[in-house]
Design a protein with these regions (language model features):
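Metal-dependent phosphohydrolase cores
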Residues: 1-130
Length: 130
């Protein structure tokens, strides 16, 4: 199983166990919508498409696990690090890239790395349509 599929399996498991059907549906649309946008923008900007796709899938995982928005970007980066480490499929620098992007995805007012900006831009873009 490739790495994106491993993450998709984890995300699907989280969403399938949500009791609120509307929130579950929104979760699928939002997480996978942002993920697809990340893949396209990363390709255009010559960033790592696979890691951007994964960052998009995991960027709001804390919210969908807890239904709590407080400090969700920071807390989500901690959970994402645990998930990625437990899969034993990612190098440390890849985990750092993904988790830093997740940590920064709600910080629209500051300049971040070009990789982080992919997730920030896609998340903003997705909120217009999803």
């Amino acid at each position: 199983m490739n790495r994106i599929e491993k993450i998709r399996e984890y995300v699907d498991n989280v969403l399938l166990h949500m009791s609120d059907e509307t929130e579950r549906r929104c979760g699928y649309l939002h997480l996978y919508g942002v993920s697809q946008a990340c893949a396209l923008i990363a390709l255009k900007r010559r960033e790592n498409v696979e890691l951007a796709t994964i960052a998009g899938m995991l960027h709001d995982i804390y919210f969908y696990l807890t239904m709590d928005t407080k400090d969700h970007a920071h807390r989500g980066s901690v959970i994402a690090r645990e998930i990625l480490t437990s899969l034993q499929s990612f190098a440390g620098d890849e985990i750092d890239m993904i988790c830093t992007a997740i940590h920064n995805h709600s910080s629209k007012g500051r300049k971040h790395s070009s990789f982080d900006e992919v997730l920030i831009d896609c998340r903003c873009f997705a909120t217009l349509f999803i």
